[in-house]
Amino acid sequence: MSDENYRDIALAFLDESADSGTINAWVNEFAYQGFDPKRIVQLVKERGTAKGRDWKKDVKMMIVLNLVRGNKPEAMMKKMSEKGASIVANLISVYQLKEGNPGRDTITLSRVSAAFVPWTVQALRVLSESLPVSGTTMDAIAGVTYPRAMMHPSFAGIIDLDLPNGAGATIADAHGLFMIEFSKTINPSLRTKQANEVAATFEKPNMAAMSGRFFTREDKKKLLIAVGIIDEDLVLASAVVRSAEKYRAKVGK
């Protein structure tokens, strides 16, 4: 068959059906199955509104749950007051909360914390002594008052790696100091590992979060300033610099 025949075949697709229903169905079938914060915000708002809920209040409750109890809502209900268990049961029902290996349209507590990280970083400052790795513990490890806003994996989502003078990389390393302790706490098999081995378990997810484009660079800058990681001149807080130095020493960077 000649090149011209192949060209005619391709051109004939001009007359092929391109109905929106079929195309949209394919879009859903082929959609990225990883974490999409925009989609999580959309689903939370839609599901909460559909049930007549104060969905913003529910978001805050889900974040607090995630910060202090983890990512398994059904399991945590077994060791909770009757009133607390009832609230969690309602959240599970309304928002179809899941755990484990979620698909694109699955809402988990950790995904809520990550998607709504502007509130998560505020809650961390209030809850620092109720977290799996406490603020006091991190202060002892860092040798300074460790930035509370960094004390959750979701913080990676507001790190701007393109900040001038390597500030973004320094923030990422400072956050890594917490992530080493957090990873060992939630995964006992890592407790006997070297720091660089533990770091290897979270580096890729952290990089994916830092590379996300849900929040603009301007958004990230505003958030980092708001929680005291950088100042208006984009200068790092001294505690961030010290924490990053500790991390680098631990992992041999």
Curated annotation (Swiss-Prot):
It comes from the Viruses. RNA binds at residues 32, 35, 68, 72, 110-111, 191, 201, 204, 211. The N-terminus is involved in homooligomerization. Keywords: Capsid protein, Helical capsid protein, Host cytoplasm, Host Golgi apparatus, Host nucleus, Ribonucleoprotein, RNA-binding, Viral nucleoprotein, Virion. Belongs to the phlebovirus nucleocapsid protein family. The keyword Cell membrane does not apply. Its main location: virion. Homodimer. Homohexamer; ring-shaped, necessary to form the nucleocapsid. Homopentamers; opened pentamers in solution. Binds to viral genomic RNA. Interacts with glycoprotein Gn; this interaction allows packaging of nucleocapsids into virions. Encapsidates the genomic RNA, protecting it from nucleases. Displays high affinity for single-stranded nucleic acid. The encapsidated genomic RNA is termed the nucleocapsid (NC) or ribonucleoprotein. The ribonucleoprotein has a non-helical structure. Serves as template for viral transcription and replication. After replication, the nucleocapsid is recruited to the host Golgi apparatus by glycoprotein Gn for packaging into virus particles. GO terms for cellular component: helical viral capsid; host cell endoplasmic reticulum-Golgi intermediate compartment; host cell Golgi apparatus; host cell nucleus; ribonucleoprotein complex; viral nucleocapsid. It is found in: Virion; Host cytoplasm; Host nucleus; Host endoplasmic reticulum-Golgi intermediate compartment. Transmembrane segments: none annotated. This is Nucleoprotein. GO terms for molecular function: RNA binding. InterPro entries: Capsid_Phlebovir/Tenuivir, Nucleocapsid_Phlebovirus. The gene is N.
